[in-house]
Amino acid sequence: MTAMVMTACTGQKAEKAEATQDNFNYVVDQFADLQILRYQVPGFESLSLKQKQLLYHLSEAALMGRDILFDQNCRYNLPIRRALEAVYTGYKGDRTDPQFVALETYLKRVWFANGIHHHYAEDKFVPGFTPEFLRTCISQIGASALPLREGQTVEQFVAEISPVIFDPAVMAKRTVQSGDVDLIRASANNYYGEGVT
């Protein structure tokens, strides 16, 4: 009854709002097996300044926690993500090149899954670009843009992350649950650190 009264009282405004909602594009991006969606947030404008500030600080806290989750999922996730982001932002070549498009898709999957493993299956992503393409891109962006450890060269960094990205046997699954192996050593997650049994 209330809905009928509200619609009857507002007349054209209700029709206009309905048309706006019908034309709203929910899909932001689509890649691999994923769709990134956006949602309408009716009433946001009517929130108080204090409520908006709370939302802002909660979103900032979520961003800070994001790196923790990346690190917990695999010890190489942060260096790989940061290197891929540096390549993505610093790439000077043709962005329609299939190798670059594949790198972009891989990076988006890493962002979505908080690491190099699928968010549900926990299997490692298979990159659609070659190790040579990644090596060339990383060498072109320079050491200052990379997450190098103290004393580590660009070549050493590439040699360290390449097997993690490209070798299907290295850190193949985020969490191994098969009973016939050492679950902690076989899993790629980073809850225990290196050498902990």
Where does each model-flagged region fall?
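Bacterial signal peptide processing site
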Residues: 10-13
